[in-house]
Amino acid sequence: MVVSDMVLNDVVLSPFGATASEMLEAARCAEDSGFSAVMTYDHLTGAMLDRGHSNDPFVLLGAIAAVTETVRVGPLVANMMNRHPAQLAVAMASLQTLSSGRAVLGLGSGSAPGSRFAGEQETIGIELLDGPSRTRRLKESIQLVRQVWAGETSFRGEFFSIEEPGLQLDLASPPPIIIGASGRKTVQLALAHADGVNITSGPKLQELLDVVANHRSSTGFETSVHVPVSLDHPEGGELTEAERGQLDRRVLAFSAPFDLRAMAQIGQAINRK
C-alpha cells in the first residue's frame, strides 16, 4: 500500500554531549537543508551510553522553535515516566504557541526493567513498571493530555488525577500525538489512540509496518521510522521499496559532534526529490 508519493525526511538531534549552541546550529542547518522536522530525545543523562550530559528537551525545543520558521518541532519521544501528563500538556501547549503551530508530541512509555535506560529512572526514584502497566499508563497519559488541551478541568484514572479548577491554557489547536513503538502492542495502541506512530528500525520493522497497513482506519494517521543516520551514505541510509511505500516520514538520528556538512549534503540529496 502506498501511503504517499514521497517520504518526508526529519532529523532527531541527540542531546548527549552536545551544547545548546551546537543543537541550535544543527537545527538551523537541518531546516536550511530541507528537512521537515527537528526533534530531540527526552533523557536526563547520557551516562548509560557513556555520552556524558544530556539537555532538557523542552528548553531546547523552545529555543529551536525560536530560531526556525518552517520545521516541525517536538520530543521524540517524551518519556511518560519523567513527568505528570498535565505538566507535559502545558509544556506542549507553550511549544505549540511559541512555534506558531509547528509542535508535535512524540510519546513513549518509559524504560523497561533491565533495559539500558532503566538506571535513569532508578536514579531519581521513579518506579520501573512491567510492560502491561506501562501500556495502560501510556494510554491514560494520552487521554489526560488531550483532556487538558480541551480545557476539561477534572480527571481521575488508575495512575493520574487532576482536580478543579483545572488548568488554563492558551492553545488554539492541539499538536498531533505520535507514539514511539518497537513492538506490536504499542503500534496497536497508537493506531487506536494517537495520530501516528514512530517505529524503531530493526528486524521487526516490516512486520510492524504491515500491522499499521492492515489496521489503520484514518487516512490522516502518520507512519514514520526512526533510523540512525549513515554519514557515509549519500542519502543517509537505505529504504527498501516496500518500506518506502508504507512510510510517510523517515527520521534520521544525528549525534554530537554534529557533522553539519554531511547533514547538508544528505538533506540536499534527499529533499530535492
Name each region found by the language model.
Residues 1-273:
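Active-site-adjacent structural elements that line small-molecule/cofactor binding pockets in enzymes
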